[in-house]
Amino acid sequence: MSALHTLSLAAIRDALARREVRAEDAVLDCLARIETTEPRIDALLHLRAEAAIEEARALDAAGPDASRPLWGVPVTVKDALTTAGTPTTAGSRILEDFVPFYDAFAVQRLREAGAIILGKNNMDEFAMGSSTENSAYKPTRNPWDTARVPGGSSGGSAASVAAGQCFASLGTDTGGSIRQPASLCGCVGLKPTYGRVSRYGLIAYGSSLDQIGPMTRTVEDAAIVMGVIAGHDKRDSTCADRPVEDFAAALASRHDLAGVRIGVPAEFWGEGLSPEVATSCRAALDAARDLGATIVDVALPHTPQSIAAYYIVASAEASSNLARYDGVRYGKRAHAPEDLMDLYVRSRSEGLGDEVQRRIMLGTYVLSSGYYDAYYRKAAQVRRRILEDYRNAFATCDVICGPVSPVTAWPLGALTADPLQMYLMDVFTLSLNLAGLPGLSLPVGLGTESGMPVGIQLLGRSFDEATLLSVGNVLSRALPPLGSPAGLR
């Protein structure tokens, strides 16, 4: 069986279970694909080639294990998640030499399920960015056009999946960082409900917003990975202690969209939405209607305020979370400081990038005694209103549907000098994180002007990932496949 990297995760998993393919063959095929594509897309920061081959050989020697749903499947992980014995930098120079001794909960779950971790994916520094150009090490390029961005902050993960370097990757979503790069790279990305997946071992950006989720090539694959990483973990006090649904069974039980009410908020379809994105997304809605869905209008009136509220809340939490990187306990340490203050200032100035410093300063400002009420308290009030908007909308629909990004992938460097314009790229994704609800991004076509992937997002009720996945699976199967990335042909 040749070109294994072109298979879905479900297909390679089944081939491995039947011993039609060895785990070592799957790993070697992905490593060969990485060797071919990595010089063009720069999706990886750390590669575990030798370790992955050894792990695959050990699995082959033991034989397939039906109790391990990812047995022998090669995957990658965003570099914000700790991996025992493998560097974890969060895309930052300040953690350049950090090698953790423990796995993040989600990584631990992958290993227990039999997955083989090939490497760690590039990302915007501390997950602060929308293009993966804020990485301290290198920008990642979009496999569909290597002159364009892959999105962010999980751009490395999206690029790896789209390029066939792995069968799945774990990303993180604080304000759209799974869904947006999935949309721009033409793959599937699931942002779970806040608390569905433990954040233990995740290098924090915004602790009340961060969530870990799968990035794959099909909705079925996302359901498989989600079933592995979801679950309670007592080491994360925000992790929900509730049963995990059988997501695969949810997919199998739905064959059309009869009886499904899809809400369409006008706020997601107005000014700023490019015509090619609107065209592709409306075609997907037409396909949903043909499958039996009922399209209803809903309102999310506080969507315009979500950008300001998000950047106040997220920056405030980041300023607290990143205070620990001071050059004293761990991380980059300035050389020959004159005194303690010089150590602090130089370690952080040299170790943290411009965007991270910008958000730390913003967060410190909005939390200061003179401005807390004017900014942070108001942002918290807007956040509650946004959650109320979603609750009201779900009174009349089962899922909400809209574009992920107002535009397709833009050229590298086009927005780096204009951070405010970059922030606007997340206008359709931020509110979901503020509400703590789940969202699924899936590709719906290629832009008529740019030829780049367009994604649509399905938004759901709290802990109702099963509905999102089952609806998304039916819809995605009815849409024409995108084909292989044009930039790598």
Curated annotation (Swiss-Prot):
GO cellular component: glutamyl-tRNA(Gln) amidotransferase complex
Record-listed E.C. numbers: 6.3.5.7
Key word Nucleotide-binding present: yes
One Pfam family of this chain: Amidase
Keyword Ligase set for record: yes
Top-level class of the enzyme under EC nomenclature: ligase
Catalyses which reaction(s): L-glutamyl-tRNA(Gln) + L-glutamine + ATP + H2O = L-glutaminyl-tRNA(Gln) + L-glutamate + ADP + phosphate + H(+)
Active site: K78 (charge relay system), S153 (charge relay system), S177 (acyl-ester intermediate)
UniProt record, GO biological process: translation
PROSITE patterns: AMIDASES
Gene3D superfamilies the record matches: Amidase signature (AS) domain
Record keywords, A-Z: ATP-binding, Ligase, Nucleotide-binding, Protein biosynthesis
Molecular function terms, GO-annotated: ATP binding; glutaminyl-tRNA synthase (glutamine-hydrolyzing) activity
Matching InterPro entries: Amidase, Amidase_CS, Amidase_dom, AS_sf, GatA
Transmembrane segments: none
Protein function: Allows the formation of correctly charged Gln-tRNA(Gln) through the transamidation of misacylated Glu-tRNA(Gln) in organisms which lack glutaminyl-tRNA synthetase. The reaction takes place in the presence of glutamine and ATP through an activated gamma-phospho-Glu-tRNA(Gln).
Self-association and partners: Heterotrimer of A, B and C subunits.
Record-stated family: Belongs to the amidase family. GatA subfamily.
HAMAP family listed in its UniProt record: GatA
Entry protein name: Glutamyl-tRNA(Gln) amidotransferase subunit A
Organism name: Nitratidesulfovibrio vulgaris (strain ATCC 29579 / DSM 644 / CCUG 34227 / NCIMB 8303 / VKM B-1760 / Hildenborough)
